[in-house]
Amino acid sequence: MAGTVAERDAPKIEDGHLNNSLGSPVQADVYFPRLIVPFCGHIKGGMRPGKKILVMGIVDLNPESFGISLTCGESEDPPADVAIELKAVFTDRQFIRNSCVAGEWGEEQSSIPYFPFIPDQPFRVEILCEHPRFRIFVDGHQLFDFYHRIETLSAIDTIKINGDLQLTKLG
């Protein structure tokens, strides 16, 4: 075989793009390449069971919040469906998740065992797509599950990131 699944799905930087699955060039920085926030990138082939999105960054020194969303396209008018929106809110120490289908936001979920983000510190968020749900890991620890509210996983083809953070890696 030509390598394991992990080797084939591992993020690779080629021609300034990450694994050709997220289509936004890396901002050139001699010592530490950073991705520009707000960020919007294409997920090649959309989501499917077994696919993982990796977001690594550093929380700003005095953050209010930051968000990571997986959406069905980039449309603003009408707004694209949001399969999952993750929002870290530092004032309330909450990691909120929700979705928006056909312009209607669902029931917000906010219970977490602990708040994993620290100002001015690096973090690693992994969004693992499984058949019935997204499984969210922060710094290697499973934090919660979010059950799909959008049926066609392959339509989830865009990642958007904004707020008080610096991105260091996407894959």
UniProtKB/Swiss-Prot annotation:
GO CC entries: cytoplasm
SMART domains, A to Z: Gal-bind_lectin, GLECT
Keyword vocabulary terms for this entry: Lectin
Listed CDD domains: GLECT
Domain of life of the organism encoding this protein: Eukaryota
UniProt xrefs under InterPro entries: ConA-like_dom_sf (IPR013320), Galectin-like (IPR044156), Galectin_CRD (IPR001079)
MF terms (GO), sorted A to Z: carbohydrate binding
SUPFAM superfamilies: Concanavalin A-like lectins/glucanases
Galectin domain residues: 38-170
Keyword Chaperone: no
A Pfam family of this chain: Gal-bind_lectin
PANTHER family per UniProt: GALECTIN, GALECTIN-RELATED PROTEIN
Role of this protein: Does not bind lactose, and may not bind carbohydrates.
Protein name: Galectin-related protein
Gene: LGALSL
